[in-house]
Amino acid sequence: MPVMKQLGPAQPKKRLDRGALSISAPLGDFRHTLHVGRGGDAFGDTSFLSRHGGGPPPEPGAPPVVAPHSVAPPAAPQPPVAVPSPADPLLSFHLDLGPSMLDAVLGVMDAERSETTATKPDGDAHPRVQHPKTRCCSNADLQLDDVIGL
């Protein structure tokens, strides 16, 4: 393994500057039409995200557009394609924490809530009350990172 020379305080480390010139230009194929930066910003062709793989469905009853030089045999009528609603999976968010992770999160949240209500003079909540489903630990002073092992 090569030995790296340590730079002293008089010689600061040089980092590679990443800019517009360090990103490869789009090559015209699907893989290189969109670039996503480290901050999540995207640039390039993002039209495929809004189309879901094709143009809008043809109007019902409208004749199909056929090039004048090609003759296609008549096709059998097909059932109409269901158009996805705007609230399809793109706008919904589902997170499954699982039973043990959910219990740990609820226990920490309830412990914090009970600590804040215990400091109020007129609070009638019981201090150190955990969520009824909490089985993770009896010490409610643990932070969430400690409970889940981070």
UniProtKB/Swiss-Prot annotation:
Tissue expression: Highly expressed in the skeletal muscle.
Positions of post-translational Omega-N-methylarginine modification: R38
Compositional bias annotation for Pro residues: 55-66, 74-87
GO molecular function: small GTPase binding
InterPro entries named among the record's database cross-references: Cdc42_effect-like, Cdc42_Effector_BORG/CEP, CRIB_dom
GO cellular component terms listed in the entry, alphabetical order: cytoplasm; cytoskeleton; endomembrane system; plasma membrane
Topological relation to the membrane, as annotated: Peripheral membrane protein
Stored Pfam families: BORG_CEP, PBD
Keywords per UniProt: Cell shape, Cytoplasm, Cytoskeleton, Membrane, Methylation
Major localisation: membrane
Location(s), subcellular: Endomembrane system; Cytoplasm, Cytoskeleton
Sequence ranges of Basic and acidic residues compositional bias: 114-127
Domain CRIB residues, every copy: 23-37
Region (Disordered): 1-20, 34-89, 114-133
Gene Ontology terms describing biological process: JNK cascade; positive regulation of actin filament polymerization; positive regulation of pseudopodium assembly; regulation of cell shape; Rho protein signal transduction
Domain writeup: The CRIB domain mediates interaction with CDC42.
Protein family per UniProt: Belongs to the BORG/CEP family.
Quaternary organization: Interacts with CDC42 in a GTP-dependent manner, and with SEPT7.
Function: Probably involved in the organization of the actin cytoskeleton. May act downstream of CDC42 to induce actin filament assembly leading to cell shape changes. Induces pseudopodia formation in fibroblasts. Inhibits MAPK8 independently of CDC42 binding. Controls septin organization and this effect is negatively regulated by CDC42.
Protein name in UniProt: Cdc42 effector protein 5
Organism (species): Mus musculus
